[in-house]
Swiss-Prot record:
It is found in: Cytoplasm. Heptamer of 7 subunits arranged in a ring. Interacts with the chaperonin GroEL. One of its GO terms (cellular component) is cytoplasm. One of its GO terms (biological process) is chaperone cofactor-dependent protein refolding. Together with the chaperonin GroEL, plays an essential role in assisting protein folding. The GroEL-GroES system forms a nano-cage that allows encapsulation of the non-native substrate proteins and provides a physical environment optimized to promote and accelerate protein folding. GroES binds to the apical surface of the GroEL ring, thereby capping the opening of the GroEL channel. It comes from Kineococcus radiotolerans (strain ATCC BAA-149 / DSM 14245 / SRS30216). GO terms for molecular function: ATP binding; metal ion binding; protein folding chaperone; protein-folding chaperone binding; unfolded protein binding. The gene is groES. InterPro entries: Chaperonin_GroES, Chaperonin_GroES_sf, Chaprnonin_Cpn10_CS, GroES-like_sf. This is Co-chaperonin GroES. Keywords: Chaperone, Cytoplasm.
Amino acid sequence: MSVSITPLEDRIVVKPLDAEQTTASGLVIPDTAKEKPQEGEVLAVGPGRVDDNGNRVPVDVAVGDKVIYSKYGGTEVKYGGDELLILSARDVLAKVAK
């Protein structure tokens, strides 16, 4: 998916992965009981923040990376029919190996 959103500073655009639809035992989880996803794919990355010395600090993730992020970090937005999340790179906790 190509996104025409360009995040500013150290922000990234993430498409959250779908939450589990069923439990391990096969029970269907209703939408109201689902946990917020904490894993997603990076769709766009900002240029990085500027530190106190005026140097640009690059972001540690790249487009296409799978990441785990803070449960309540970022701002949810709808764009082009998709639910996306714009969050600071500081809210990213880890990259998931492919």
